Every structure is written in C-alpha cells, then in structure tokens.
C-alpha cells in the first residue's frame, strides 16, 4: 500500500461520519467522539504536544469506568449512532483497565481504538475485540517492516482487513510525516484532489468532539 493509498483509506474511514450526521430538530449532532482515556504514552512524537514535557508531561492519570459508564448512558439517551474513538493524546492500551473501559463504552455505534501498536499482541487484540472494539487504527512509527508484522498479528487474531487500518507514520518532517492535507473546501489545488459535491450540506464544523 503506497502512502497515497494509505492516506486515502484513512480519509475514507472518517468521511462517512463527517458527511452523514444525525440531525435533531434541525441541528446536526456530533458524529465523532474522541475520548482521551489515559494521560500515559510510551512514545514522544515530534508532532504531538508531548514532545514538550513542560507543556504536556506524562502522567499516570486514567479515566474511570464510572465516567465511561456515564458517557455511554448519555450517548444512549441521544440515540447516538456515530463513532467513538479511544485516542486523544495518550496510548489507550496503557490504561490499566482497558478491557473494562472498552466494555463500558460498547454500544450500537462504531468503537475504535487508535494505538501505536507497541503493546498489541494476538491475545490483546482478541480481548479488545471481545470487549467491544470493532475497528483498530495502528499508527506505525518505526518503518515499513511493521506492516507485515501487524497484518500477521491481526490475521492470527481472526480479523479481516475490514477490521483494521495500518497508517504509515514513520516519515520525517521533510516528508510531512507521510500525511496529506485535504483541499480545504476547494481552495487548495496541490496534488490531485477528488471533486466534491458543493451542493451538499457541510457538517465539518460540528461533527467532532473530544472528551478528556
């Protein structure tokens, strides 16, 4: 998979939730809830606030299951059908009660986990899946050799390619970290940008929220 293909796959992962939101009494409801369940991370990336320890220190602070129970209950009251993403600025697999957190948040929506993959094993993938995770997002920072490693791990856990995405994040700043910007609503024309339907409503300003 080339960088462009990997990036497009990642954009497709979110586009359905950005473009198809619930509208309640004429007001769009958020469709993408990013939850920062832990302040722990085992890496320091140059494009993350954690690169400056004075600004964002590594702390052993973890969201409680009592709080995630409350979040899940309030989302149920809204008949929420978007996505919940366990990510934020921490490494979610470092949460000491990660399986309980996942089980607490499991519901009639997509439940993703975004991870650097350092703590993943075939067994932990199986346990996370059984607890309620239905999509894995792995950011690979060490090199292209990680692709085969993680593909084998997920396949050994019984998951197909529709249950995970491997994002190439091992690029440096000169290569924009392997990321590709969107066309910013049609005002940027660098590279080949797909045409968009300008007559459709835009929910981008309201689709996402973060809970910390």
What are these regions (language model features)?
Residues 2-135:
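Conserved alpha-helical substructure of the radical SAM core
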Residues 2-9, 24, 36, 57-58, ...:
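Radical SAM enzyme [4Fe-4S]-AdoMet core and its adjacent flexible, acidic
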């Amino acid at each position: 998979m080339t960088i462009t293909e990997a990036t497009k796959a990642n954009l497709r992962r979110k586009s359905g939730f950005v473009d198809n939101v619930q509208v309640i009494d004429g007001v769009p409801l958020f469709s993408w809830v990013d939850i920062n369940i832990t302040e722990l991370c085992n890496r320091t990336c140059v494009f993350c606030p954690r690169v400056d320890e004075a600004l964002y220190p590594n702390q052993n602070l973890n969201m409680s299951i009592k709080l995630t129970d409350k979040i899940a209950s309030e989302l149920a009251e809204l008949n929420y059908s978007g996505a919940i993403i366990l990510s934020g600025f921490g490494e979610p697999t470092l949460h000491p009660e990660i399986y309980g957190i996942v089980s607490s948040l499991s519901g009639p929506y997509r439940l993703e986990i975004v991870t650097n993959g350092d703590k993943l094993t075939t067994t932990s993938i199986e346990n996370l899946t059984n607890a309620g995770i239905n999509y894995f997002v792995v950011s690979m920072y060490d090199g292209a050799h990680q692709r085969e490693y993680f593909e084998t791990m997920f396949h050994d856990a019984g998951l197909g390619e529709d249950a995970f995405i491997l994002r190439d994040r091992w690029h440096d700043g000169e290569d924009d970290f392997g990321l590709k910007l969107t066309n910013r609503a049609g005002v940027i024309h660098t590279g080949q940008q797909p045409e968009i339907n300008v007559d459709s409503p835009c929910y981008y300003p309201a689709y996402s929220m973060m809970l910390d």
